Swiss-Prot record:
EC number(s) on file: 3.5.3.6
Annotated InterPro entries: Arg_deiminase (IPR003876)
Biological classification of the source: Bacteria, Bacillati, Actinomycetota, Actinomycetes, Mycobacteriales
GO cellular component term of the entry, any: cytoplasm
Alphabetical UniProt keywords: Arginine metabolism, Cytoplasm, Hydrolase
Pfam families on file: ADI (PF02274)
Domain of life per record: Bacteria
Subcellular location per the Swiss-Prot or TrEMBL entry: Cytoplasm
Similarity field: Belongs to the arginine deiminase family.
One GO MF term: arginine deiminase activity
Catalytic residues, chain numbering: 391
Protein's name in the database: Arginine deiminase
Organism (species): Mycobacterium ulcerans (strain Agy99)
């Protein structure tokens, strides 16, 4: 077990990571609900589990300690305070009405940690409400279809990158932008607040008022953080995070990187990820377009520069001579296909060693030609939620870079 937790880069040797093995929450997806729950298709769940098990086993084979979110949550829910917190976040009295909310809350508080953990992640339909949680005076119960959700499932828990971020020795619980994902942050909050593994570790970014998501946050180098601003993270969120990191001495420079507000580029890590201390894989169609506003800590406050080309701004902030950009292919059709299939969304296990989906053959070949070791996993079903190995992992501990 690794005792010292934290991370100051994207590529330091990975020691501890949080994953979430997909389960019942994915089986809840239907053609009627998939758009609302942010999935582009209906995954074959058993195959998705096989692919995820392969991913987890690959990490373990490389010496990474894999923590599973559902197990951490179950262990944290032995705390009475954690149970109260989880139930309060899951039961929406504005949607359910006071009578049903009260009965449901009382029922959930009486569940054992394993069962409560399952409900908090997989959700619950009206048909699954036990008799003692049904109230005859609830119009909500009478008017809802049995298959409707009294507690909505969280299929996007698969993407543990977004709901918590480790920067230096601290963690950030962000504010997620999409309604279908808001409650995910409450579960990571419970884990970090009540699981003994994280006792004494301090939180960063206390505000959590403006949306910031982990997929938009890249630790380019010690003290240098890039934050994508687009569909999920707002300018206000990026600025609030930057000022918080400066106040806590966790960064000296933050690059705010505007990205297109569309599904294919929902986060910065869908178009760009670090694969070595001075190498980045980037979607070819944005290489010449990506810019950055440089936010720097100063003795008397902060300064914000005008937008400059992203690579130039990154090189200057990182204090290196060159940042090698590895493109995703010359053929624009292949590049677009592989970007959609998360070809740029790699997880670094060490400098120059990454995990990638096997289906992105051209991107992987270009990485290997640039001297990067590429470890591949299947992702035909995992990718239906538009996330790759980086999206599916929350690094909790990496060896620090100097």
């Amino acid at each position: 077990m690794v005792d010292e937790l934290g991370s100051n880069s994207e590529v330091g040797t990975l020691k501890v990571v949080i994953l979430h093995r997909p389960g019942t929450e994915l089986r809840r997806l239907t053609p009627r609900s998939s758009d609302q729950l942010l999935f582009d298709g209906l995954p074959w769940v058993s195959r998705a589990q096989e692919e995820h098990d392969q991913f987890a086993e690959l990490l373990r084979s490389r010496g990474v300690e894999v923590l599973l979110l559902s197990e951490l949550l179950t262990e944290a829910l032995h705390s009475g305070a954690a149970r109260m917190q989880g139930v309060a976040a899951a039961v929406d009295s504005r949607r359910l009405g006071i009578p049903l909310a009260q009965e449901l809350s009382a029922y959930l508080r009486g569940l054992d940690p394993v069962r409560l953990s399952h409900v908090l992640t997989a959700g619950m339909t009206f048909n699954e409400l036990p008799a003692d949680a049904r109230t005859d005076v609830s119009l909500v119960v009478r008017m809802h279809h049995d298959a409707d959700f009294v507690i909505e499932p969280l299929p996007n828990l698969l993407f543990t990158r977004d709901s918590s971020i480790w920067i230096g020795p601290r963690f950030v619980i962000p504010s997620l932008a999409m309604r279908a994902r808001v409650r995910e942050a409450s579960l990571t909050d419970i884990i970090y607040a009540h699981h003994p593994r994280f006792t004494g570790i301090r939180r960063a970014y206390e505000s959590r008022t403006a949306p910031v998501e982990g997929g938009d946050v890249l630790l380019l180098a010690p003290g240098v953080v890039a934050v994508g601003v687009g569909e999920r993270t707002t300018p206000a969120g990026a600025e609030a995070l930057a000022r918080s990191l400066f106040d806590d001495d966790l960064a000296h420079t933050v690059l705010a990187v505007p990205i297109a507000q569309r599904r294919a580029q929902m986060h910065l890590d869908t178009v760009c990820t670090m694969v070595d201390v001075d190498k980045v894989v980037m979607y070819a169609n944005v290489v010449d377009e990506l810019t950055a506003f440089t936010i720097e800590r100063q003795p008397d406050g902060v300064t914000i520069s005008d937008a400059a080309p992203f690579v130039e701004a990154a090189v200057r902030a990182m204090g290196i001579e060159k940042l090698q950009v590895i493109g995703t292919g010359i053929d624009p059709v292949v590049a677009e296909r592989e970007q959609w299939d998360d070809g740029n969304n790699t997880l670094a296990l060490a400098p120059g060693v990454v995990v990638a989906y096997e289906r992105n053959a051209q991107t992987n070949a270009r990485l290997e030609a640039a001297g990067i070791e590429v470890l591949t996993i299947g992702g035909s079903e995992l990718g239906t939620g538009r996330g790759g190995p980086r999206c599916m992992s929350c690094p909790v501990a990496r060896d620090p870079l100097p």
